[in-house]
């Protein structure tokens, strides 16, 4: 993993990435490709949904040939099985998300028949922002539970402003 900043903010990322596909595919694949493939169990999609990421799409208007950029929340990209809020003239050019702070708790999990070289049966990720003993913000996502990668808005809203306890 080349990014020192990502290693700093996501100390478990290298181990988590070992669960994604195989070494040759990881070396050839792209984050954008993982998103626009629209697999309901895409590991990196679930990871970045929990980061409440926004993507930037660059496109060309067909008639006027004018170039444009538009921003789409990753959670709004998926409209149905393999259906995206993205035209054939658009490409994904960047991904934006807030870096975790010292008050951030983040976890990604993947369940599959084999530990390595296997697609997920189900996967999930959660990002919590904690202030004292209260969850100030929550973002939860899951794959393998619907025809699209799911940002769990109701679960996220339910957790926000809840106290943290050992129970």
Model-derived features: positions:
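C-terminal structural segment of proteins
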Residues: 1-167
């Amino acid at each position: 993993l080349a990014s020192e900043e990502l290693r700093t903010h996501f100390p478990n990322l290298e181990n988590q990435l070992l669960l994604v596909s195989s070494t040759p595919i990881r070396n050839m694949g792209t984050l954008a490709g993982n998103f626009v493939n629209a697999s309901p169990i895409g590991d990196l999609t679930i990871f970045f949904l929990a980061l409440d990421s926004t993507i930037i799409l660059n496109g060309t208007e067909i008639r006027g040939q004018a170039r444009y950029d538009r921003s789409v929340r990753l959670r709004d990209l998926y409209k149905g099985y393999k259906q995206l809020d993205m035209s054939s003239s658009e490409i994904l050019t960047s991904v934006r998300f807030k870096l975790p702070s010292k008050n951030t708790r983040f976890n990604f999990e993947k369940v599959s028949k084999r530990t390595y070289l296997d697609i997920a049966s189900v996967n999930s990720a959660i990002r919590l922002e904690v202030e004292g003993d209260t969850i100030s913000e929550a973002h939860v996502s899951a794959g393998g539970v619907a025809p699209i990668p799911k940002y769990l808005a109701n679960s996220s809203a339910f957790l926000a402003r809840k106290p943290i306890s050992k129970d």
